[in-house]
Amino acid sequence: MSNLQSIRLARERIVREHMEAENALEMHRALGTFAHPRYEIMATGHVYDGPEEVNRYYRESRAAFPDQRNELISLRHADDAVIVEFWLRGTQKSPLGRLDPKGREFQCRMAAFFIFEGADLVCERVYFDSATIRRQLTGAS
């Protein structure tokens, strides 16, 4: 196995572990996949940097969507990243910003760039269409 193949395999294992930990609501395990925890949510402009902020993101997102889960669609490698397409699904059970909960489910196709420095995961940068989720949660057409 080449060095590049070894690096890609190790990175892929980290990303899969991270996504599985989120689905199992084992946020300490998901946090542990980072060398330095950082989330960048591009649709909202929010950045959560460091363990305390990333834990806050986990608490807030899972309070609104306690059954939030991801389903991997595809995974690709770049020089410094693993790029993942996935379905994110959940049911809103508590307020999300100004959106009151109506018990509605959402499903949104998303992309995440898991950014690496060498073998270390240092950032998850997530891209999605927030209007898709808002429409499903509010029932607007």
Residue spans for each PLM region:
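C-terminal and inter-domain tail/linker signature
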Residues: M1-S141
